[in-house]
Amino acid sequence: MSRECYLTGKKNLVVNSVIRRGKARADGGVGRKTTGITKRVQRANLHKKAIRENGQVKTVWLSANALRTLSKGPYKGIELI
C-alpha cells in the first residue's frame, strides 16, 4: 500500500533544501549566497485508519485533512470506524 491519502490523494513531495550564508541586504549585508542545494522529502501528514466502505472494512492511509472531513460524518459512502 503506497503512502497516499485514500480520499484526497495527498502524498510525499520532493523539495529542495537550500543552504545559504551571509547577511541579508536589508540587514546591512551584501546579500545571501546559496552554498548548497540538496533534495529532500516533505512527508504528507498521513495516518493509517480503518474505514467502512460499502459495508467492507479496509485499512487505508488518510491525511489529517481527510480525517477532519470524515469526523464530521460519512463522506462519499466512507465512514471512520
UniProtKB/Swiss-Prot annotation:
Instruction: Output the Gene3D superfamilies linked to this UniProt entry.
Output: Ribosomal protein L28/L24 (2.30.170.40)
Report the record's Gene Ontology biological process terms: translation
Output the SUPFAM superfamilies linked to this UniProt entry: L28p-like
* The keyword Magnesium appears for this protein: no
Keyword list, A-Z: Ribonucleoprotein, Ribosomal protein
GO-annotated molecular function: structural constituent of ribosome
GO cellular component terms listed in the entry, alphabetical order: ribonucleoprotein complex; ribosome
HAMAP family assigned to the protein according to its UniProt record, in alphabetical order: Ribosomal_bL28
Quaternary state and partners of this protein? Part of the 50S ribosomal subunit.
Family note:
Belongs to the bacterial ribosomal protein bL28 family.
| Name of the molecule in the record | Large ribosomal subunit protein bL28
Origin species? Deinococcus radiodurans (strain ATCC 13939 / DSM 20539 / JCM 16871 / CCUG 27074 / LMG 4051 / NBRC 15346 / NCIMB 9279 / VKM B-1422 / R1)
